[in-house]
């Protein structure tokens, strides 16, 4: 399976697992996309459940900080994969040097930080169920 890599500029962080990006397609062609972090689920930041909302805002803050603290951002798209809302599924990598050597992966880092969990779209559990399992 061939994957595609694009340089990107962050436009907006929607929540912990969704980002608006301007991707560089080359030849001075740019395209705005909404990306869902592949394999990642964060709590909702727009919910009436106050505990989940608090965690969702922390996850969003983590994502913003991660993107701000890395100089170069790259998108590794998952071919022919969109979520049910039409968002592109992708892994987000960063590099801190001009050689574009990837040094970190947002998808992995947000899960390891405890602000997200792995998710591949099947048998999703609520955050309350997930929290009980991790205690």
Where are each of the predicted segments found?
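Small beta-barrel nucleic-acid-binding modules, primarily SNase/OB-fold domains
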Residues: 1-135
């Amino acid at each position: 399976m061939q994957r595609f890599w694009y340089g990107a500029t962050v436009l907006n962080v929607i929540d912990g697992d969704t980002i608006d990006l301007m991707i560089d397609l080359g030849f001075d062609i740019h395209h705005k996309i909404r990306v869902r972090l592949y394999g990642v689920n964060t709590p909702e930041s727009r919910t009436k459940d106050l505990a989940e909302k608090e965690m969702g805002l922390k996850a969003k803050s983590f994502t913003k900080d991660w993107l701000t603290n890395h100089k170069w951002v790259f998108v590794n798209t998952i071919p022919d994969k969109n979520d049910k809302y039409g968002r592109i599924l992708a892994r987000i990598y960063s590099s801190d040097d001009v050689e574009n050597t990837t040094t970190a992966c947002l998808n992995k880092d947000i899960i390891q930080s405890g602000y997200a969990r792995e998710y591949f779209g099947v048998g999703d559990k609520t955050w309350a169920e997930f929290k009980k399992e991790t205690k």
